[in-house]
Amino acid sequence: MRLTGSRPFAKDGSPSDRGESIAVLRRAVELGVNHIDTAAFYFSPLRSANELINTALGPYPADLVITTKVGPGRDSWGEWHSARPDQLRGQVEENLRQLGRDHLDVVNLRRRADQESIAEHFGALAELRQAGLIRHLGVSDVTVDQLTEALAIAPVVCVQNRYGFDLREHDPVLRACAERGIAFVPFFAIAGPSRQSGRRPPEPAPLLAVAGRHGATAAQIRLAWTLHQSPNVLAIPGTGNVAHLEENVAAAALRLSPDDLSLLDAAD
């Protein structure tokens, strides 16, 4: 999401440098990144994440998986709205048009904050999957019960929930995904709730200590800790900067020891 500019969900955010955003995407593929997360509502003044992806990477590499999201989203004025089940097809078609594709690899259903049952919305996406517009389905911001509800309707390949070093309330969902062979895709793995809102509290001493042991940044340790939680975890840290991208990718090579993990877990 950082591709489109600063304060991406704010109406007064600054658009990104188009050339740099395209360079980030192309460098990601060069580094072996084969999973990109996007959405039609990822935009800022003058910039659309889907359009940038289409320009930078089309025609797409055969092994590249592009995952998008539908459900509550923003209109062209930046206002947020819910979506009825019958409106999801329009959102899917918008993503298809912006990405320049005839199908979507993975579509996640975003759950509305006050939504208890996702059956009707997920069922609508399952119909679009049967129609060939979508290859695989996922869900986002769900509980274990809601995941179970979705699985009764159609296969689920991934769950995208908030999760990270200081944001661990979705541990039960992660474990449920691991048991079922479903990818768990955390967002805010680096940022966390405070950093995402723009605040920068001091990093915990244990995290800095582990970073020092590995000659890594605190952000890299946050990302490495998240990846160490389970083999089914896939990370989607956002960036609009090539150097930051390379730092994030390097974090995947960090191997935290049992002592490292114990120290970090004690800091929760």
List where the protein language model places each region:
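N-terminal small/glycine-rich loop or linker at the start of catalytic domains
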Residues: 1-12, 67-80, 103, 108
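N-terminal binding-site loop/beta-alpha segment at the start of enzyme catalytic domains
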Residues: 1-64, 191-193
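Glycine-centered flexible beta-alpha turn that most often forms the glycine-rich phosphate-binding loop
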Residues: 36, 104, 137
